Amino acid sequence: MSRARPEVAVGAVVVRDDRLLVVRRGHGPGAGEWSVPGGRVEGGETLHEAVVREVWEETGLEVVVERFLGWVERLGGEHHFVILDFCAGLLEAEAVAVAGDDAAEVAWVPVHELSEIRLVAGLHEFLTDHGIIV
């Protein structure tokens, strides 16, 4: 059993034209795997502020949080994350995403093709359970 203290993190589910915004993680946990943009909530920061900041840092895109989608808990090794995922919309519809911070790569992947890429553990099921993948 891990003795790691739970850390609060956020994720941003951003869909445009039936494509999901995903980043390839540059660092662990999940290095090399695709995930939605997100990360740890910093002290003094609201959940919505954390979503906006993480998307900006990892993709260069500006978003507005639309609604809470759901939460997951990820335990492994030295990590224990409680991740709260939010649907977010782009402030500028035609903005171009550019990988930054700990994102090695950024892409818009058609929702129906998500099963063909290496997603972080549990993400495909989460997106299916919450109606993003149908």
Predicted feature locations:
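Conserved hydrophobic "DFG−1" position in protein kinase catalytic cores
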Residues: 14, 22, 88-90, 108
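Conserved Nudix-box catalytic region and its N-terminal flanking loop in Nudix hydrolases
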Residues: 19-57
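A short coil-to-beta-strand element that immediately follows conserved catalytic motifs
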Residues: 62-70
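Active-site-adjacent beta-strand/loop module that shapes the phosphate/pyrophosphate-binding cleft
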Residues: 72-95, 130
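Conserved beta-strand segments that form the floor/walls of ligand-binding pockets within enzyme
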Residues: 9, 35, 85, 107
